[in-house]
């Protein structure tokens, strides 16, 4: 095999006969591969299945990798295969005495496949010889054919990519590589050989990709080549056939490596020797001097039809002697042939490895063939050759897909979503915003940086919660204060309000549960000239500090649900408190104008927010219906004034009996009952305390009417009072009815919800029952099918028994016939003997 083979002395008929023999050899190999393809496919499927099972944690330690049966200590012990090193059971392996170990069934089958396909022979021969067998014969015949046509040798002894096991190489040293380029056969033979070459190339590419079991990219590549195998074979075969046809039509193009470009065209179209590495030639020389015509006996130069320099700027590698005119036909032929070469080169060198230096100092990269026999240059203008189909990395494709997926958290709602304005979401959002604003204002007033910067005033002095720096350092009479201002909710911090800052209110568990109100509260000041004293402001600031500290400590210990209840009850109590305080301030102003009193100085007047409780109580008949409002709305103004000023004495007998005028108290009760009736679950989301403003306007009108009616006799006042008392009774009854209705409605809603939930549960149970029934029906059907199969088997057994009986009868009859025949024969013999004796 290693010796030189010279077939130049063969005649044309002998060469055709040799080519037929080679073609028959290829056909036989194809049939053999088709016969072994089924076994290969089974082994591939088994290998992929075992690979998936082995990736599961500790699967092979407890179960067999082949039949998945669990291991037991005595009945089914585990044994390790010598080839695949997987744990297998007793039934899936056999003992090898020569190797003294166990081998599984799949590994035995793979060994059998290797022996039948002669893989060991080809691997050893390819490693020792560059070309052998039919490939060597085809090379010599093709070289002889080219020499006869007048061209120099294209394929010297070491000119092609020989003996390569590369996964995508077409010129790989196989027996069918050079046969496709010969012209001593028909077009059908050319097509079959081209298809065979393409199939071998793609099969080698698949085999090499499957060898890398650890690389996921190689596994995906092998899977892709398996799926598109037929398409790739057709494309590769068409390119091979086109190349053969073009070479047959244009014999002058075969001389492209025997000429050198003129010197004036070096800048535009470089010569082959200028773009090819001298290491790419083995035992070869080239005469590429400018201006010299290549000799016919030029030394053998490595001509690689699969050069890696695929730059579009590179012209066709055809050289002509200077002075020879170039015709248009030759130019078109060269362009067509170079385009065909580029198409075939794109699929020819997928396995060549880069041998660039680390510093990448060379202008063009260097590639090396897998067998180490060839080194070629690659132009820096194009990317390095890849596999037949260049696929994306799996990680890159997964990341690209995941980048367009919407996150599951984007579609989930939360109580912090600004678009969710209904229910507890809006209330909690509003509480948090106002809590942050309130803590900012209260904390920033004690910050020295805040005091030296310009900020708008926080709130009016009448609110009593926050003190402006101007009101603290100036007189209350001269300092202007806004008449009305939207005041922040004083209980935004989680915790109950202090008794010295707010009127008393009952615990939420003691009062009737009312719908939640928004904490937007109006701060009405009907006396703009009346403000708090500076000393009062300082005391309030200290009280604010104490309350803030207490709130912080309570916030850490209290639970979230109790904080919500405290916020709800505080907001409800504060709404009524602010309205009552505003009306009392107006009442006080009117009394100051009519009754001469000695408490006109601002020092004796205290803010309504620091008034104490338990100075008065409503009448007993209304105490039950309005307990949650009257307790929070008790008006201790006149008692506080009386305690501060001993000279103060009310003139009206009604005022002597009660600390506050009874008519005013009735009006307040009436207004509070209206407020309670207007508040409902529907007003929680949409109302902005519009009823409070309307009630305030009505109160102002009634107070003015009351002031004008003071000059009338007492009888009218008593009649009005009686009528108002009746109205109050009616309204209180209506109030109780409404509360009962709302409570009944809530109960009904809860009952309906529970009923719906129970119905859904019953439906789920019914669905489960139906599924179980369907499963039982399927089981019954399967049981019936099994019974029918058993009946059929029994019928067949009975038929067989009947046939056996018939056969036995026939045998008996034949035996009887034979016995009769024997008797007849004996009788005849006896008769014959008797005759002879006679």
UniProtKB/Swiss-Prot annotation:
Region (Disordered): 263-331, 444-501, 525-570, 681-838
Listed GO MF terms: actin binding; myosin binding; small GTPase binding; zinc ion binding
Alphabetized SUPFAM superfamilies for the sequence: FYVE/PHD zinc finger (SSF57903)
Keywords: Coiled coil, Cytoplasm, Cytoplasmic vesicle, Metal-binding, Zinc, Zinc-finger
GO annotations of cellular component type: cortical actin cytoskeleton; perinuclear region of cytoplasm; transport vesicle
UniProt feature, compositional bias: Polar residues: 263-290, 451-484
Biased composition (Basic and acidic residues): 697-736, 753-838
Zinc fingers (FYVE-type), renumbered ranges: 58-112
Oligomeric form and interacting partners: Interacts with prkar2aa.
Role played: May link secretory vesicles to actin filaments. May function as a protein kinase A-anchoring protein (AKAP). May act as a scaffolding protein that links PKA to components of the exocytosis machinery, thus facilitating exocytosis.
Record's protein name: Rab effector MyRIP
Taxonomic source organism: Danio rerio (Zebrafish)
